[in-house]
């Protein structure tokens, strides 16, 4: 997945997945980079849980208006969209891509803070739980296994948890 070019988020719960999808629109539009929100295929898709679906008006307030950038599909003016870049353009394409992908971590946190103000649920790229001087083991998790790990660290005070929500780009902070 390193070179696919997609930003990757992993959701611990169905609520987090829905909330992250809403936040992802801003990130994808701001940077012109596709975003995937990953849901555990078996554990989350084969269970049910209550989620709060926000009113469309609240989501519309949160999301910026769609900005037309000149790359919209128009049958009267066909264009080629895809991942193939000829060698003479690849250097600039790759430089531009990495300049944008390096903005993901900070922009993701800013979007999450705005989301918390609007909807009252807090998310961050990385969540550290019970990590301190007493910690001997740290469980690093993605997705729904995090919920199981939360139960483990309650029983074992020397075990901490590091939950990754943002995986690509891998958080550096």
Locations of regions flagged by a protein language model:
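Conserved thiamine diphosphate
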Residues: 1-41, 65-66
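Thiamine diphosphate
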Residues: 3, 113-173
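A generic short-segment signal for beta-strand/edge and adjacent turn/coil regions
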Residues: 3-8, 104-111, 157
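Catalytic cores of large soluble enzymes that bind and process phosphate-bearing ligands
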Residues: 9-19, 96-107, 141
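Gly/Ser/Thr-rich loops at beta-strand to alpha-helix junctions
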Residues: 14-15, 42-44, 142-148
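Short acidic, glycine/serine/threonine-rich loops at helix termini
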Residues: 19-22, 46-53, 150-151
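Short, low-complexity, polar/charged sequence segments that are solvent-exposed and flexible
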Residues: 26-30, 55-58, 157-158
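Conformationally flexible catalytic loops at phosphate/diphosphate-handling active centers
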Residues: 35-127
């Amino acid at each position: 997945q390193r070179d696919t070019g997609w930003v990757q988020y992993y959701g611990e719960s169905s609520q987090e997945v829905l909330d992250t999808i809403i936040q992802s629109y801003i990130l994808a539009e701001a940077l012109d980079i596709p975003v995937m929100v990953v849901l555990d295929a078996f554990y989350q898709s084969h269970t049910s849980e209550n989620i709060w679906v926000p009113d469309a008006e609240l989501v519309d307030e949160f999301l910026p208006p769609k900005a037309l950038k000149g790359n919209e599909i128009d049958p009267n003016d066909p264009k080629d969209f895809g991942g193939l870049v000829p060698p003479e353009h690849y250097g600039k394409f790759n430089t531009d891509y990495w300049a944008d992908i390096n903005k993901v971590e900070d922009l993701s946190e800013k979007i999450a803070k705005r989301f918390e103000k609007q909807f009252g649920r807090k998310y961050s790229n990385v969540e550290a739980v019970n990590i301190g001087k007493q910690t001997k083991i740290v469980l690093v998790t993605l997705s729904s296994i995090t919920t199981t790990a939360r139960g483990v660290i309650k029983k074992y005070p020397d075990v901490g948890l590091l939950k990754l929500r943002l995986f690509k780009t891998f958080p550096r902070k």
